[in-house]
């Protein structure tokens, strides 16, 4: 869930729109400590089917729209699950390994259009075994860098922040748990408009629709 490019099918164009980076907060650093493939993982055939939908099965694709590889990682999603370099430059096996970690964290909602099209469920994720070689993932720590402003600018910023906090205070919020994704949360809380509406309501905090963090607080869209 951020510049890279994806295969230009209707599915990938939609994924590109939902994964656009929105300014709202500055991330000075993000480090995940240890990653592990799930004890149960989807079969290679399942990943081949997903890749066929996402990129016509082209594991080394980079067409310039912010997505890479067979299952169309964004660079931020790839790095969040421990990937190095660019996804399309990694082997198919490495891409599948990182995709398994992302699927374990986010569910099939990390690929909302193609997973629904293919009818993928948790049963597909439990179809094959892989060895866990690293530590379990933990929530990402983030820090914000604030540029110093003049006294007048600071006063205006404080007023804007107070107004934003007042709006957030009136809205219902939820806290991300392990295994959550925008797709699963939208279903759980019956969000009108689905995961895309939940993403739109949290653009300031969620830069990539495929990547949310354990402990992160999200605002539920108001009906």
From Swiss-Prot:
Residues 119-223 are annotated as: Not required for resuscitation activity. GO terms for cellular component: cell surface; extracellular region. Gene3D superfamilies: 1.10.530.10, LysM domain. Its EC number is 3.-.-.-. May be subject to further C-terminal cleavage as the protein identified in gels is smaller than is expected. Residues 1-41 form the signal peptide. Activity on the artificial substrate MUF tri-NAG is inhibited by 2-nitrophenylthiocyanates (NPT) compounds. Changing residue 54 to K: <2% MUF tri-NAG hydrolysis, 20% M.luteus cell wall muralytic activity, loss of resuscitation activity. Keywords: Hydrolase, Secreted, Signal. Factor that stimulates resuscitation of dormant cells. Has peptidoglycan (PG) hydrolytic activity. Has little to no effect on actively-growing cells. PG fragments could either directly activate the resuscitation pathway of dormant bacteria or serve as a substrate for endogenous Rpf, resulting in low molecular weight products with resuscitation activity. In pM quantities promotes the resuscitation and growth of dormant, nongrowing cells from M.luteus in addition to Mycobacterium tuberculosis, M.avium, M.bovis, M.kansaii and M.smegmatis. Belongs to the transglycosylase family. Rpf subfamily. This is Resuscitation-promoting factor Rpf. The lineage of its organism: Bacteria, Bacillati, Actinomycetota, Actinomycetes, Micrococcales.
């Amino acid at each position: 869930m951020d510049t890279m490019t994806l295969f230009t099918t209707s599915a990938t164009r939609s994924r590109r729109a939902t994964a656009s980076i929105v300014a709202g907060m500055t991330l000075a650093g993000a480090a995940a400590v240890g990653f592990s493939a799930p004890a149960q993982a989807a079969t290679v055939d399942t990943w081949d089917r997903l890749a066929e939908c996402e990129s016509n099965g082209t594991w080394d694709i980079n067409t310039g729209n912010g997505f890479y590889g067979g299952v169309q990682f964004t660079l931020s999603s790839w790095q969040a699950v421990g990937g190095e370099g660019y996804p399309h430059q990694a082997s198919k096996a490495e891409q599948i390994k990182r995709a398994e970690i992302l699927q374990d964290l986010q569910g099939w909602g990390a690929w909302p259009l193609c997973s629904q099209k293919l009818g993928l469920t948790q049963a597909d994720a439990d179809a094959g075994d892989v060895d866990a070689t690293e530590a379990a993932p933990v929530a990402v720590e983030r820090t914000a860098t604030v540029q110093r402003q003049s006294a007048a600018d600071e006063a205006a910023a404080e007023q804007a922040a107070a107004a934003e906090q007042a709006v957030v205070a009136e809205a219902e919020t939820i806290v991300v748990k392990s295994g959550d994704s925008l797709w699963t949360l939208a279903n759980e809380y019956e969000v009108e408009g689905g995961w895309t509406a939940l993403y739109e309501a949290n653009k300031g905090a969620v830069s990539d629709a495929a990547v949310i963090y354990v402990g992160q607080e999200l605002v539920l869209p108001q009906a």
